[in-house]
Amino acid sequence: IKTDLGKAYLKAYGAYYNLPAALQGETALGEDETRNIKGVCPDGWHIPSQKEWQTLSKYVLDSGMAAIMNDGQVDETAIAKALASTTMWMLPEYTEIEPQPTWVGVEMEKNNATLFNGLPIGFRACAGDEDWMHSCYSAGWWSSTAGVQMGPEFGITVRLWSDLHTFVTNAEFN
């Protein structure tokens, strides 16, 4: 890390990786594959597959932890709110529609029903300049499944997933 900004992001959010760096030479999973890809994760942990992310989303919905929109509907923002930390989130500077109660930057005390504690990490463009994008109002983590992630020119963080298929909410693993 060469700059003070980069060092600050590392301290607050952890390392940002492009996909090849995150996978550490392993081949991304095919759609129906179920093996764990360790990549940059320590022993006992792996990069979650798209199926594991979908299982988490289904759990949030089925358990009633997702927030409800003004019209009574539940959408992907309702799932995000249940996974988002209760601090650091902001609304984008410009929005075309009225903010909904499901948005993570609205009524943040209602965020994090799951204790997942997702931080607004944004992402980084890796094509030369140190360009940090959408921090404070977006989050995303790599999937080990091919074809569902951002391009290799972007850097985002890795969310550790236990090989024991348990969720850890301890701040040490955030």
Label for each model-derived stretch:
Residues I1-N174:
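Conserved positions within compact, well-structured domain cores
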